[in-house]
């Protein structure tokens, strides 16, 4: 091509490849961050390296294998100990509660109406949280506990006790899955939910078929122990750990009230330990509800991806 002499040719500018690459990597990481954050900011498996850079899955990369070993070790030891125990039949004196007063035509009045908080907490959770199966199952179990426990305390016997324990088993299984989702990995928690529910249901059927409560007691005991281990070994992904601690303390208090039913009732003959157990357990469920209502995603400024600003305090 001819170029007139009075028009100087312009040299072609070189593309700054390093700057272009930097901008591309920054925008790609931002896109990956948006893609990697699922419902309510949870890390998905789409971009585990990016999640790790934010500190969301630090425990997975550093502690996954040891914790899996601890988890299955606890599982094996607890189940092994269960086999060594003799069968545990349902003690019929369990149905003889200290407070058996009939008020307004309702037998065992306070043990029945003290289940109303379960209905309120469960309904609030179901109304607010509908996307995660484990969360739905947990609050569904809490809601149904209000119905099943009221039904049982209206006429305490083994048949009605089954419908009291069934929804509690749903909540125990879902609680373990929730903590695995929150502390370890969302996918692992979602997978764990269904076998945990199956084991819980089987434990109740085994009790009704063979009058053996060993597996049911394990279903109550093991999730609490596993949750404690997970809390000790894994970093939280969300704020609000104090709500989990409050829930644990309140549930322990509920079990204490259960074992001191008559002693508490004998003090004033007003409220029994079992009534207080219902209120403390419902308060524990409320603490978990508050956790889900108020939690915020925790980010780690020291390991932020390139191109992303520091999070505001």
Positions of the model-derived regions?
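Charged/polar low-complexity intrinsically disordered segments
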Residues: 5, 13, 29-30
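Short, low-complexity, charge-dense intrinsically disordered segments
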Residues: 23-26, 35, 40, 46
